[in-house]
Amino acid sequence: MLCIKKMSFSNSNAQHTGGGGGAAASVASSDSYSGSGSGASGSGSGSDNVLVIKTVQIAPVRTLMCALKEILIETNITFQKDGIRIINMDKSHTMLAHMFLEAVNFELYECALDKIIIGVNMFHLFKLINSIDNDDTLTIYIEKKDYNDGVVSYLGLKFENGDIKQCKTQKLRLIEPDPEDLVEPQVAFSSVINLPSCDFQKIIRDLSCISEKLEIKSVGNELIFRCSGQFATAEVRRVESDGSMEFLHKKDSGKIIQGEFSLKNLGYFIKCTNLCNQIEMYLDNDMPLVVKYYVASLGTIKLCLSPLPSS
């Protein structure tokens, strides 16, 4: 089980937060709204909206939604002045996803309130996002009429394609937000490793054919992936080298760091592969494994997996 309240990830030299995890709080009522002129929804001027976000980075957003729907069935999404946050666990409480997309990285980001929290079925959101074309511009918005004293009933999505002069508008019916207050775990990790995301994907895919469990071990300047199944065993060794694998931080080069993790759950992690070229892996004994992906230039998502019990 993951214990995630009142903590945040870091290596032992510097805090590793990627923007932090906003805790749930009472949202300001619509009385505190001051217009955010953007005209996003096709339903009037910008003053009709409490939230307007615009991006042309369609492929990363689609990839992100595809990965999150496998881990989180339902989740809160928090919109604040500085960006968008998701922090939640899967139903088994063995995986945690923490996403932060910074406001400054969007083509347009206007949040009229200090905090807006919505509850979303991730599969339903993915079904809507998945229909967007890579050439479209995506606008996410919340109309003032759909915001009532901190409760949001609909999330608007607008797809615009200037080449064919087409505008498609959809509104996702929202669910009640989870009242539980989650923040990002704060943990000091002994080892932080940089690895190509496609290499990590291939290792996980290949070893998933052999076993359900994967041992990850850091020894000296080596990173070792090892598994054992009914019909075979396998081992992949990576040595630190320029452009391939690099230890960004290792507290004690002589210390052996290892843990055993579910390959099925790691299979959900590698759905983020196309988001970036390199991942950061955070390792320590008797600690969750954390894999950090960059969501193109929008922000980061950190995926956390608790170790399997010792056999």
Language model segments and positions:
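DNA polymerase sliding clamps and clamp-related checkpoint/processivity subunits
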Residues: L2-K69, I73-C209, E215-S311
